[in-house]
Amino acid sequence: SLSNKSAGNSVSYTKEEYETVIFDKVLLEKTSMLDTPFWNRIVQILGGVVERTTSVVAYGMGSFETKNAIVQMGCLLNLVDYLRRRNESCSVAVEIFDPVMSELDVGLVEKLGFACVKENENCKRIAKESTLFFLPHGDIFMYGNLLETNIESDTLENIILVGNGLTNYIENASRLGSGLAFQNHQEETQLSLKSICKVREILVENVVHRHRIAPPKQQIRPGATGAKVEGDKQQQGISLDGNLERAFNDTSICTFARRKQQ
């Protein structure tokens, strides 16, 4: 059984009770999200890049006893439904992994029709086909491992990345002296992400925080140097409700194009 500590009084669930209670909460988040500007913005961005996407890999959502994970799973269900509608002739395979997931979490994932990755890949999945990677609030090493693996396998263009703002991660890490850098094994040097590929990054939302200046009207965050940045500059910042804000603050969608060798 699992103790649900977030409910005030400690509640223990059996496997069946856990799957039923959390399953219902996930479906509620899934349904309520469909009417939000946040979800409409995701659909607007993904519309031109997922025509052939039939694989989804989600890392780092955590245990579904947390509210963030429940909201994020609701979003993932909507993403999968959207991909299946866009690719009616193909099935969409979904795999999920987080090392903190319990047996009850694994049971819930399977009840939802998804598969759990059996071993910790450390986010080193090669995108052999067009794959949507869902990394809400992922750590920078997760992005680094995923990108470096696909740089080495020359499969960067198969990645659609939904997660934390990548440009902010790169800039913040660089200030700390730990920026994303990738090994050039032939020349034994390190290369920055921007020197290897073009990054197209679109911010899903600008959260309006209390006691802070409202975000600018421009909805597209400047990408990495040399990046191709597109979008509707007249789009207003989207103010999320509390649950969405905590689960998806600073979310962006990135695609990548390998730079041609000189």
Regions found by a protein language model. Name each.
Residues 92-95:
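Short beta-strand element of Class I
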